[in-house]
Amino acid sequence: MNYTSYILAFQLCVILCSSGYYCQAMFFKEIENLKEYFNASNPDVADGGPLFLDILKNWREESDKTIIQSQIVSFYLKLFENFKDNQIIQRSMDTIKEDMLFKFFNSSTSKRSDFLKLIQIPVNDMQVQRKAINELIKVMNDLSPRSNLTKRKRSQNLFRGRRASK
């Protein structure tokens, strides 16, 4: 590589790092705007302990933590939905919402759209309730651990192997 290539590569690194820093700084600025609007720095906010942080500390396994995080993300989306008509904090909420969804779904748009579709389902709608009850067995089966199926397949393969060797 010649000097020009090194200089261009260095400039690209500087640009990417500074834009990442800028995005991060903008993100923190938007959170500070929300803290100011909701008066979240007031000492009485600490009454009763943290809302989510203790719960997050209790869960170590990635799959378990993801379940808890999905509920927390859902909470924030509902919170932002309640204030969607507030022009003072709209930009801050939109910025944080986009960043939160991007991070939570690892930039997967299909997972994101499915998640958003799920949290928009109206629980009080009779037709929705009927459909949900109709699908309950399949959902419960999907929630069941796969270990029994894996053990059964393993024992079947082991049995077949013994029979073939005789």
Swiss-Prot record:
The keyword Glycoprotein applies. Its main location: secreted. Released primarily from activated T lymphocytes. It is found in: Secreted. GO terms for cellular component: extracellular space. Homodimer. Interacts with IFNGR1 (via extracellular domain); this interaction promotes IFNGR1 dimerization. This is Interferon gamma. Pfam families: IFN-gamma (PF00714). Keywords: Antiviral defense, Cytokine, Glycoprotein, Growth regulation, Pyrrolidone carboxylic acid, Secreted, Signal. Type II interferon produced by immune cells such as T-cells and NK cells that plays crucial roles in antimicrobial, antiviral, and antitumor responses by activating effector immune cells and enhancing antigen presentation. Primarily signals through the JAK-STAT pathway after interaction with its receptor IFNGR1 to affect gene regulation. Upon IFNG binding, IFNGR1 intracellular domain opens out to allow association of downstream signaling components JAK2, JAK1 and STAT1, leading to STAT1 activation, nuclear translocation and transcription of IFNG-regulated genes. It comes from Ailuropoda melanoleuca. Belongs to the type II (or gamma) interferon family. One of its GO terms (biological process) is defense response to virus.
